[in-house]
Amino acid sequence: MFQGAVALSLDAKGRLAIPARHRDALTPDGAPLVMTVHPHRCLLVYPLTAWEPIREKITSLPGMDQATLSFKRMLVGFAQEETLDAAGRVLVAQSLRQFAALDKQVWLVGQGTHFELWSDAGWQKQQEAMLALVDNPLPAGLENFVL
């Protein structure tokens, strides 16, 4: 279970040091992890075993409609398998860094089965958008949710 948000830094080569507490779950037995893009201009970071059923679902989507094709191209087309180096770092491909506008400071945000990787500016903007929703009714299924 991946949870929490932590500010991290990309090094000059575009590598990200994965926090030690998440390494074994993210890359069990040295398995690769998968990074791909999200339409909100962040990256998704999955253990390979969690990504594979998602990829299968996406690639089996029927359709010649533009929305389905674009969805497939985005999520599967940008997907990259990467392995951690001996220091627990993973290279974030230039194409992915460019898509998500990642600079030196980034945010790794747990989402249960995976992480989101945000630029500092993108994460700040996302937090402001979440706070703006406070005055709106909760979405279906969360009406009775109490913290």
Swiss-Prot record:
GO molecular function per UniProt: DNA-binding transcription factor activity; transcription cis-regulatory region binding
GO biological process: negative regulation of DNA-templated transcription initiation
Origin: domain of life: Bacteria
Keywords of this entry: Cytoplasm, DNA-binding, Repeat, Transcription, Transcription regulation
Residues in SpoVT-AbrB domain copies: 5-50, 79-122
Main location: cytoplasm
Pfam family, one: MraZ
Gene Ontology CC terms, in alphabetical order: cytoplasm; nucleoid
Membrane-traversing stretches: none
Subcellular location: Cytoplasm, Nucleoid
Family (UniProt): Belongs to the MraZ family.
Subunit relationships: Forms oligomers.
HAMAP family (alphabetical): MraZ (MF_01008)
Protein known as: Transcriptional regulator MraZ
Provenance organism: Azoarcus sp. (strain BH72)
Chain's gene name: mraZ
